[in-house]
Each structure stands twice: as C-alpha cells, then as structure tokens.
C-alpha cells in the first residue's frame, strides 16, 4: 500500500509523462508535493521503485518509466500501449540507415514490428540556439503507440545539455508532432528570429514568450511573439545505448 505522498508523486509523474513524454524534474516534483528538499523526493522515488511502480533507467539522470499504477489511479496491472492518446516511454533503440539529403519528413510503416520509420530531419539545440534544421540525416523506428493518429511527426537529434533535468540528454532523438500551437509547460521546437532552432519549455506571459531550459546553467530567454515560431511539440524520446 502506498502512502499519500507516494501516491501523489506517482500520479504527478504519470500525468507529466502523458503530457510531455518526459518525466518532471526533481524541483518540479518538490514543488508539486510541497516538500522542502529534494532528499524527500529521492526517498519517495526509491520507495516507488522498490514497490515495482516505476523504473529508473541506468546511466540517465531522472529518466523514469511508470511500470504500473495502483487501482486508485485506474491501474491494476502493468501498463501497456496507450488507448486514448499516447503512453510516452523512453525507448532504447538504434539508428536506421542514412537518409537522402534534403528528403522531406515521411512516415514508413516497419513490417510486423508495431513501429513506424521517421526521418531524422537534423539536429536541434538543447542549449544555445543553433542554425535552423535544414535537411534529413537518417531514419529511426518509432513505436506506433508514441505517435498520435492525427498530424505529421518527425525526429531530431539533440545537441546540448540544457534539458537534462527534463530527462533529455545530448545525443537523444526526440519525436516531435508538427504544430504551431503550444500550451504553457509544453516542450517545443521553437524557431527563433527565423533562423535558429532550439528545444525548450514554452511559456507565454502576456505578449512575451519565454523559453525555459531544464538546467540551471542556462538562463530563461524572453522574446516578443513575432520572434518565436513554434514548429512542433515533444511527444517522445528515443535513446541509443
């Protein structure tokens, strides 16, 4: 049986994974549970892992997968593929063959695997913005459960460490659903001033847009609405070991 705090934390992690595709940071967990220190979060996570509700992925800061939910959260067993919307997970996988330069993003079903081949359209900065994505580089197989039934999807290789507290490291491949709209808290691909692309957490404040890193070493950057164009929202993460 879980304590009240353990249940609250499990529900918070599960909802964030459903929404963003990545787990919350320890600071976000601490704030959500109204705790004074991160050590309390560490103890709660350890307890949830020991009871078989979550799994921490090795060699990765704050990479957490929810394995099952208790009956009180609508669980009762191991989590499978999502039914209404995606059940985001960190997928350990490999890269496909290189794509032809300049190819457009496309979806290619991978026979008998329950996966779809996405084009990796280039590299995205998780740090200081870099030049905008310009051409396809390779392909990657993405589980169909990670993709929504509507909208176009593409993949990008992450460069930089500004999103490490959101569980996104240098070298990861992020799966993006193409959209020009975002809600506060979404992790998005943002095109800054028409030529620099970056992966950040989105927040609108009046007529200004703030792009937040998930690493205290990087400052929050503020722009006017006409300086930032949302090009997609994070829906999943693929990691090669």
From Swiss-Prot:
**Keyword Transmembrane applies:** no
The family annotation for this protein states: Belongs to the peptidase S24 family.
Say what the protein does. Represses a number of genes involved in the response to DNA damage (SOS response), including recA and lexA. In the presence of single-stranded DNA, RecA interacts with LexA causing an autocatalytic cleavage which disrupts the DNA-binding part of LexA, leading to derepression of the SOS regulon and eventually DNA repair.
User: Per the database entry, where does the chain bind DNA?
Assistant: 26-46
The main enzyme category here is: hydrolase
Give site residues, Cleavage. 126-127
Question: So what does this thing catalyse?
Answer: Hydrolysis of Ala-|-Gly bond in repressor LexA
Can you say what this protein is called?
Answer: LexA repressor
**GO molecular function, a single term:** serine-type endopeptidase activity
Q: EC annotation?
A: 3.4.21.88
> Per UniProt, which keywords does this protein have?
Autocatalytic cleavage, DNA damage, DNA repair, DNA replication, DNA-binding, Hydrolase, Repressor, SOS response, Transcription, Transcription regulation
Subunit-level organization: Homodimer.
The Gene Ontology biological process annotation of the record reads: DNA repair; DNA replication; negative regulation of DNA-templated transcription; proteolysis; SOS response
